Amino acid sequence: MKGSTVHTKWQAYCRLMRIDKPIGSLLLLWPTLWALWLAGRGIPEAKILVVFVLGVFFMRAAGCVVNDYADRHIDSFVKRTASRPLPSGTISEKESKILFVVLILLSFGLVLTLNSMTIWLSLAALALAWIYPFMKRVTHLPQVVLGAAFGWSIPMGFAAVSESLPLVCWLLLLANICWTVAYDTQYAMVDRDDDLRIGVKSTAILFGQHDKLIIGLLQLATLLLMVAIGWLMNLGGAFYWSILLAGALFTHQQKMIAQREREPCFRAFLNNNYVGLVLFLGILISYW
């Protein structure tokens, strides 16, 4: 195989795993770090931290691969996704399946270094990662499944650090689901016209003209759940300041999506990286 061909293929694999678009990994990373710090009431064990950070990137890559495989026959009809490696033919279906298996094996190899409770919970993570891409064909609520998939590192983190699943763990998972549905609805607003044309379901379509209101309510629910978590965990003032900053970011996002235009909606989605970061810094400083 010629060097240029190898380079082209490697670039295609990177695009399939979204290495060139780290936003998804970051949105998966922040809740993971929230959970690890809350479960350990401070900096977690180094080995556990490394396992989860690597696991985030491997599982996010695996999720992107299976998502593109599931959407391979419809992505060519959507402007934003038509040039992806599978619909464009740069990578074959067989190659994508092999890559998915490799990424899952790498992820599971990491989990095997943790306790048995975490290993069992990881099976649910695999199931959620596999079924999510197919949900948009059967329900208008695929974003809820995505929220569970993106948040499943939370119970896994608590299990790995404390071998327990306290109330705070489930409140944090619920907060993450609310947040995920909010930001992924913003993301779905970008593709709403294309999705309506090809019959793909999403919360952006389900919510219709009430989309901005429901996103706002989900963002409010996220903040209120975070307040409850801060109270239960006796977190310091820095955490509550971080909640206020997250609220300001949510308000800014509402302004961006006000006209429901594609580019501002996508920027609002990207802005959620700062929400996750700010909340993590609030937790981090509280345990300093």
Swiss-Prot record:
GO cellular component, one term: plasma membrane
Pfam families: UbiA
Organism per entry: Yersinia pseudotuberculosis serotype IB (strain PB1/+)
Cellular location(s): Cell inner membrane
Catalytic activity annotation: all-trans-octaprenyl diphosphate + 4-hydroxybenzoate = 4-hydroxy-3-(all-trans-octaprenyl)benzoate + diphosphate
Membrane topology listed for this record: Multi-pass membrane protein
Chief location bin: membrane
GO biological-process terms attached to the record: ubiquinone biosynthetic process
Xref: InterPro entries: HB_polyprenyltransferase-like, Prenyltransferase, UbiA_prenyltransferase, UbiA_prenylTrfase_CS, UbiA_sf
KW Cell inner membrane (keyword) present: yes
Pathway of action: Cofactor biosynthesis; ubiquinone biosynthesis
PANTHER family associated with the record: 4-HYDROXYBENZOATE POLYPRENYLTRANSFERASE, MITOCHONDRIAL, PRENYLTRANSFERASES
Transmembrane segments: 23-43, 46-66, 98-118, 141-161, 163-183, 213-233, 234-254, 268-288
Molecular function in Gene Ontology: 4-hydroxybenzoate polyprenyltransferase activity
Name by which UniProt lists this protein: 4-hydroxybenzoate octaprenyltransferase
Keyword annotations from UniProtKB, A to Z: Cell inner membrane, Cell membrane, Magnesium, Membrane, Transferase, Transmembrane, Transmembrane helix, Ubiquinone biosynthesis
Entry function: Catalyzes the prenylation of para-hydroxybenzoate (PHB) with an all-trans polyprenyl group. Mediates the second step in the final reaction sequence of ubiquinone-8 (UQ-8) biosynthesis, which is the condensation of the polyisoprenoid side chain with PHB, generating the first membrane-bound Q intermediate 3-octaprenyl-4-hydroxybenzoate.
Family as reported in the entry's similarity comment: Belongs to the UbiA prenyltransferase family.
Gene name tied to this protein: ubiA
EC number, as in UniProt: 2.5.1.39
Cofactor: Mg(2+)
